[in-house]
């Protein structure tokens, strides 16, 4: 979001938390601004701007500090949806945290007041961009630090010119008390402007030329399951190589993911079903053996009791 790009940053009339449809006739890449929303959280202002250019719709998030300093992130609408879901996980985790102990705050002060280790971390990867989300804490409180790194060699929605392979990064810090308000504002923009997202079918640099580009305007919704302390996310995406399923394994301090192409889903599903059936049979056999062992030790006693009852 360059200076002057956003209608809300220019001080346009919608006021705090107001949607502000706007458009731009010319400019670089003929970018059109579709909506803008402003949030005031503690002493910071956050702007969420939905924009569109020839490559599709995308979201720009800007943080404006008390001194006027700005940090900006750029997300495709598909990544924005993943980001919204991740915010839900952080909100849930934050709600379960108790207050910081005096010892923890004192330790933070001894370290110069800087953030302690992350209370929860996740990351998102899409094409040439990576997003790192860390819930941290310092003497001023808890906050979600969001860092974006961009490989300039990959192009994309908001990428400007730069030497191939060169990485740049931007970071914003969202006070934890504003997580729900921020998530709800983001969800509203996605609901209103994410339905016709061409990028969902083509990827940040994609078009209609790839194997899946432009052919899959609708994909299955993502889902997740929780097992003990782990959570597994299933997200369907599409890029120039076709449709894929990303399976992410998430623990409080760890995240790993695999990507399964659409043509292998049937084989993966068959393998899972086969192993589930085999394990069910193994468990049943073990249970039967356990019952037999228990019955063998007490069977005689049960029979004698039955005979005594008959004699009575």
Swiss-Prot record:
| Positions of modified residues (N6-acetyllysine) | 267
Which parts of the sequence are annotated with region: DNA-binding?
28-254
Q: Which GO terms describe its cellular component?
A: nucleoplasm; nucleus
Key words, A-Z: Acetylation, Activator, DNA-binding, Methylation, Nucleus, Phosphoprotein, Repressor, Transcription, Transcription regulation
User: Molecular function terms in GO for this entry?
Assistant: DNA-binding transcription factor activity, RNA polymerase II-specific; DNA-binding transcription factor binding; DNA-binding transcription repressor activity, RNA polymerase II-specific; mRNA binding; mRNA regulatory element binding translation repressor activity; purine-rich negative regulatory element binding; RNA binding; RNA polymerase II transcription regulatory region sequence-specific DNA binding
Question: Which segments show compositional bias classed as Acidic residues?
Answer: 302-312
Per the record, residues carrying Phosphoserine are 6, 8, 101, 298, 304
Question: Which residues does the record list as Phosphothreonine (modified residue)?
Answer: 31
State the compartments where it is located. Nucleus
- Which segments carry the region annotation Disordered? 1-32, 284-312
Keyword tRNA-binding part of the UniProt annotation: no
Q: What residue spans carry the Basic and acidic residues bias annotation? A: 284-295
Chief localization class? Answer: nucleus
Q: Name one Pfam family in it.
A: PurA
Q: In which tissues is it expressed?
A: Expressed in myocardium of heart failure patients.
Residues with PTM Omega-N-methylarginine: 24, 152, 294
Spell out the disulfide connections.
none
Q: Which residues carry this modification: N-acetylalanine?
A: 2
Q: Name one GO biological process term.
A: positive regulation of transcription by RNA polymerase II
Q: Could you share any additional remarks the record makes about this protein?
A: Defects in PURB may be a cause of progression of myelodysplastic syndrome (MDS) towards acute myelogenous leukemia (AML). MDS refers to a heterogeneous group of closely related hematopoietic disorders. All are characterized by a cellular marrow with impaired morphology and maturation (dysmyelopoiesis) and peripheral blood cytopenias, resulting from ineffective blood cell production. Some patients with MDS develop acute myelogenous leukemia (AML), a malignant disease in which hematopoietic precursors are arrested in an early stage of development.
Q: How does it assemble?
A: Homodimer, heterodimer with PURA and heterotrimer with PURA and YBX1/Y-box protein 1. Interacts with MYOCD and SRF.
Protein role: Transcriptional regulator which can act as an activator or a repressor. Represses the transcription of ACTA2 in fibroblasts and smooth muscle cells via its ability to interact with the purine-rich strand of a MCAT- containing element in the 5' flanking region of the gene. Represses the transcription of MYOCD, capable of repressing all isoforms of MYOCD but the magnitude of the repressive effects is most notable for the SMC- specific isoforms.
Tell me the protein family, please.
Answer: Belongs to the PUR DNA-binding protein family.
Q: What is this protein called?
A: Transcriptional regulator protein Pur-beta
Q: Which organism is it from?
A: Homo sapiens
- Provide the organism lineage as a comma list: Eukaryota, Metazoa, Chordata, Craniata, Vertebrata
What gene is behind this protein?
Answer: PURB
């Amino acid at each position: 979001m360059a200076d002057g790009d956003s209608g809300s940053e220019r001080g346009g009339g919608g006021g705090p938390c107001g949607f502000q449809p706007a458009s731009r006739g010319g400019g670089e890449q003929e970018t059109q601004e579709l909506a803008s929303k402003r949030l005031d959280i503690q002493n910071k202002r956050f702007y969420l701007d939905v924009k569109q250019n020839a490559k599709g719709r995308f979201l720009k998030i800007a943080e404006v500090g008390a001194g006027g300093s700005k940090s900006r992130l750029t997300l495709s609408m598909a990544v924005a949806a993943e980001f919204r879901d991740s915010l839900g996980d952080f909100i849930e985790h934050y709600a379960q945290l108790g207050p910081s102990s005096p010892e923890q705050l004192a330790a933070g002060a001894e370290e110069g007041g800087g953030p302690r280790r992350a209370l929860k971390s996740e990351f998102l990867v899409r094409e040439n961009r990576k997003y790192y989300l860390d819930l941290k804490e310092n003497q001023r409180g808890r906050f979600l630090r969001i860092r974006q790194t961009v490989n300039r060699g990959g192009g994309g929605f908001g990428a400007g010119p730069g030497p191939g392979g060169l990485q740049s990064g931007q970071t914003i810090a969202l006070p934890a008390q504003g997580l729900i308000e921020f998530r709800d504002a983001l969800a509203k923009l996605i609901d209103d402007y994410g339905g016709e997202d061409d990028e969902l079918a083509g990827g940040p640099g994609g078009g209609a030329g790839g194997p899946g580009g432009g052919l899959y305007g609708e994909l299955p919704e993502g889902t997740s399951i929780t097992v003990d302390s782990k959570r597994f996310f299933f997200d369907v995406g599409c890029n120039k190589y076709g449709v894929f399923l990303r399976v992410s394994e998430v623990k409080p301090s760890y995240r790993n993911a695999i990507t399964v192409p659409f043509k292998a889903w049937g084989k993966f599903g068959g393998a899972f079903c086969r192993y589930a059936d085999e394990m069910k049979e193994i468990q049943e056999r073990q249970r039967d053996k356990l019952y037999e062992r228990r019955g063998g030790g007490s069977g005689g006693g049960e029979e004698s009791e039955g005979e005594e009852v008959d004699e009575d």
